[in-house]
Regions:
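Aromatic/hydrophobic pocket-lining residues that form the small-molecule binding cavity
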Residues: 15, 88, 92, 162, ...
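Metal-dependent polysaccharide deacetylase catalytic core of the NodB/CE4 family, i.e.
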Residues: 25-121, 126-131, 139, 144-150, ...
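Glycan-processing catalytic domains of CAZymes
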Residues: 6-7, 72, 132, 144, ...
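C-terminal domain-boundary segment and adjacent tail
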Residues: 24-26, 30, 40, 100, ...
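A short acidic, amphipathic alpha-helical/loop segment
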Residues: 17-21, 120-124, 165, 193, ...
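Short beta->alpha connector loops
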Residues: 10-13, 113-117, 155-159
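Boundary/entry segment of secreted carbohydrate-active catalytic domains
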Residues: 1-14
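Hydrophobic "anchor" residues on beta-strands that sit immediately upstream
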Residues: 5-6, 69, 207
C-alpha cells in the first residue's frame, strides 16, 4: 500500500482554502509554521513577483489547521546556517514552545527554512526536541530515511513529473511525499489541478493518506 504524505509551508492565508479542500477528501497533511511571524490578525508577509503574500492571524490558526499535523518551521524563517549558536537555539526552541502552547499538541517535526541545514543545524534541531526534519531534497526512496533529520521529498505538488514519480512510488509500495506553498496556487486552473490530484489519490485503492509522525511512530516500534 502506497503511503502518501503532503507538507505545506509558511502559514499563508491560502492555507485556509487548502485545508477546507483537503478536509473534503479526508486527506491528511502537515503544515509547517513560523510562530514569530504571525500577528493577531492577518498581516502582509512579502511579495512574490506581482503577488502579495499574506499570513494568517493567530486567532484563526487553530480553526484553520484543526485536525492536521503541525510542524515547526522556525520562529522567523531565517537561513539557519547563517545564525550564531544562541540565535539558532532561540529560533528552534522558542518556536516549538509557542506552537505547542497554542495548539496544545506535541510538535515532533521540523522543516528547514529555505531548505538550509548543516551538521550544526541538525544537532540543534534534535536538541530542541524534534524527531524529524524535512528538507527540499528530492530522493527516489523517501522512507525510511537514512537520517530522520534529512528527510527527503518526492517532488513539489506542481512538478510536471508528479504522476510519474507517484506511479514509481506506487509500484514499489513505498512513500510518496509532495510539498509546496499554497500561495503558489495563483489561478483557478492551478486549484482545479491540485484538487484533481487529491481526488485521484483519495480514490486510488492502492494508496492511503499518511502523516510523517505516524510513519515514524511505526518505524520506531519496528526498531524497538
Amino acid at each position: 500500500m502506497l503511503k502518501v504524505v503532503q507538507s505545506w509551508d509558511d502559514g499563508v492565508v491560502e492555507d485556509a482554502r487548502l485545508a477546507e479542500l483537503l478536509r473534503g477528501y479526508r486527506a491528511r497533511a502537515t503544515f509547517n509554521l513560523n510562530p514569530g511571524l504571525h500577528r493577531r490578525q492577518r498581516s502582509f508577509g512579502w511579495r512574490c513577483g506581482d503577488q502579495e503574500v499574506w499570513r494568517l492571524g493567530w486567532d484563526e490558526l487553530r480553526e484553520v489547521y484543526a485536525g492536521f499535523e503541525i510542524a515547526n518551521h522556525s520562529l522567523n524563517h531565517p537561513n539557519l546556517t547563517e545564525l550564531a549558536p544562541l540565535d539558532l537555539e532561540r529560533e528552534l526552541r522558542d518556536s516549538r514552545r509557542l506552537l505547542q502552547d497554542w495548539f496544545q499538541q506535541p510538535i515532533r517535526g521540523f522543516c528547514y527554512p529555505f531548505g538550509g541545514f548543516n551538521p550544526a543545524v541538525k544537532a540543534a534541531v534534535r536538541a530542541a526536541g524534534h524527531d524529524y526534519a524535512r528538507t527540499v531534497t528530492e530522493v527516489e526512496a523517501v522512507f525510511p530515511p537514512a537520517d530522520a533529520l534529512e528527510l527527503g521529498v518526492s517532488c513539489r505538488f506542481s512538478d510536471p513529473a508528479f504522476w510519474s514519480r507517484y506511479q514509481c512510488a506506487r509500484d514499489k509500495g513505498g512513500v510518496f511525499l509532495f510539498w509546496g506553498h499554497s500561495y503558489e496556487l495563483r489561478s483557478a486552473a492551478l486549484w482545479a489541478d491540485l484538487e484533481a490530484k487529491i481526488a485521484h489519490i483519495t480514490a486510488d485503492p492502492a494508496a492511503e493518506w499518511a502523516s510523517l509522525e505516524a510513519l515514524l511512530a511505526v518505524q520506531e516500534q519496528s526498531d524497538a
